[in-house]
Amino acid sequence: MVLGNIIEKYTPSKETKDLSEYYGLTSDTDVALICNNEVIDTKGKLVNGEVYLSYETVRIYLNARFYWDPNENILRYTTANDLISVNAESSDYTVNKDTQSFGQTIVKADASTAYIAIDFVKQYSDFQYNYYTDPNRVVLTNAWGDYTIASAKQKTEIRYQGGIKSPILTEADKNTELTILEPGDTWTKVATNDGYIGYIKSNKLGTTSTTTISSDYVAEEFSHITKDYKINMALSLIHI
């Protein structure tokens, strides 16, 4: 009996984590969002095979310059030279007065918010994304810079939390590259390229190195007025 308890104590669990629960998915149209190696609370929507992001998600995580007018059901975006406008449920958009086709519905609106096609957002924003299925999820990146990485030395489990009794999120094959989030002596918190954030035994990781993630997005430049003298902003009070 004692021996059996000891064996049970040191035997790794084979239980797998319910991924819908892990990502907070409640319907087939929900899309989990992983932004800069963090599973965020808000969800995207899958409509006719295309990913849409809520207006709030776009503003908070990707580009605060989009503006949704719920009264007119119009999405607007301003560049240095252009005003872009999109009517809800339309596949067309206008750049100033020129109408262009996007090839799919750009904005889906309901009573509470608007959902914007992710590819339309990307057209005007500095981020990268990859979409995965089983379950539906999008991995977003817009935090550019250096990251610490290491490869799995052998096929091994990535668990929900540190500890051999924690459920398995996914498996990492030998030589799978992982991003190190929180190194530890026994367990290390890692992120996979396809959107799992969990823990791996530290002795299953190879030597760490640094990789640089960069963007090829060309940001637009806004012109501004410059003067070679000071401008007096004092208010003039007129008494009648």
Describe the predicted segments one by one.
Residues L46, T192-G195:
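Generic detector of intrinsically disordered, low-complexity, polar/charged segments
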Residues T186-K189:
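Short aromatic-glycine-enriched beta-strand elements
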Residues V2-G184, N203-Y229:
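Primary recognition of N-terminal secretory signal peptides and signal-anchoring hydrophobic helices
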Residues I238-I240:
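Conserved small/polar residues in nucleotide/adenosyl-binding loops
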Residues D194-K204:
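A short macromolecule-binding patch
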